[in-house]
Amino acid sequence: MVDIVECPVCKNTDLQKFYHCEDYTVSHETFHVKQCAQCSLAITTPRPETEHLAKYYQSDEYISHSGKSSGGVGFVYKLARSFSLTWKRARITNFRTSGSILDFGCGTGEFLNTMRLSNWNITGIEPSPEARLKAEILNSIKIYASLDELTDQKFDIITAWHVIEHVPDLLQTIQKLKSHLNKGGIIFIAVPNYQSPDAQQYREQWAGFDVPRHLWHFSKTSMNSLLMSVGLKLVDTIPMKLDAYYVSMLSEKYKNKNKMDLSCLIKGFISGLRSNFLARKKINYSSLIYLAKTDEV
């Protein structure tokens, strides 16, 4: 195990006990989550060594990599993903109607395919060999395994949909992504928000913690601190309202001894409604998309 003793964002060493969370998906091990007393970044620590992280993704329940779904939550996930592909494209075309796009952590490639069909020049990065192969078949292009495989390519838009929380080298990854951004380009970073109403409701059983796959856990404050630390400027924050329903249903499953039934779906739906209602004033939704650009004039 690797013990993180310093916040990578603000370099503060005062990491305070926050939650003890179970890995409900694969190992059923318990992991500690600590919170930086200065910037509020929450950190899974101790965490598995980087070379051992892959085994914690080896489950058909990890839908974004397996492409498989079963049961009520799997159905909800697939339904939400189908809608979100078009929704994400619309968010991007608010800024540009065409150009080059890098999807960092592209999974099985559905979002890239959506952008390809809209005449965008697409590039994808995906570390999972199985997901990468599916993305290559779907899009008929080479998908890179890591950022290090890119040379001096630059992009008008870079997207990281629920992936930054997975990377071991947080600061270095954001710095590398910034280096591949064209002048005037925008990076879209989507992550769970551990200060959302549904996170406050479910606490250590909140599915958004997803330890140990999620190594970092963000609040709006900590994400803004991260962006500023690498010279990126936050230009907008967009809620992902559907996430509250899916995450709440999973959280209800965890409360129900990891068994999904109709009551979990109903309670999760109600919790999602409640979370979205309470999140309105402060834009404190279950998941948020942060739009950032370089602060260079």
Provide a role label for each language-model segment.
Residues 50-96, 114:
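Conserved class I S-adenosyl-L-methionine
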Residues 30, 207-220:
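Acceptor-substrate binding/catalytic loop of class I
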Residues 1-5, 18-25, 236-297:
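A C-terminal cap/extension of S-adenosyl-L-methionine-dependent methyltransferases
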Residues 70-73, 202-210, 250-257:
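Short glycine/proline- and charge-enriched loop/turn segments
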